[in-house]
Amino acid sequence: MGNEETIAELNAQLMMKETRVRKLARLAGELPLTRENLPALECYALELRSLAYQIRQLQVAKAAAFAAR
C-alpha cells in the first residue's frame, strides 16, 4: 500500500473511532446518574479509554506516514 493510501486508511479509521467516541459521550450524557446506571457508565468509560488509546496510536501512525512522504 502506498503512502497516500495508508494515510487515507488511517483517516478513515480515525473518523470511525471519533464517531464512536461522540456516540458514547452522547449516550453517557443521556443516562441519569443513578446506582442502576453505574455499570453502563463504567462500561462506557472503559470503552472511551480504549478508544482514546486507539485514536492516539492512529495519530502517531498518521504522523509517521506524513513524515515518510
Indicate residue ranges for each PLM-predicted region.
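Short, charge-rich amphipathic interface segments used for partner binding and complex assembly
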Residues: 12, 16-68
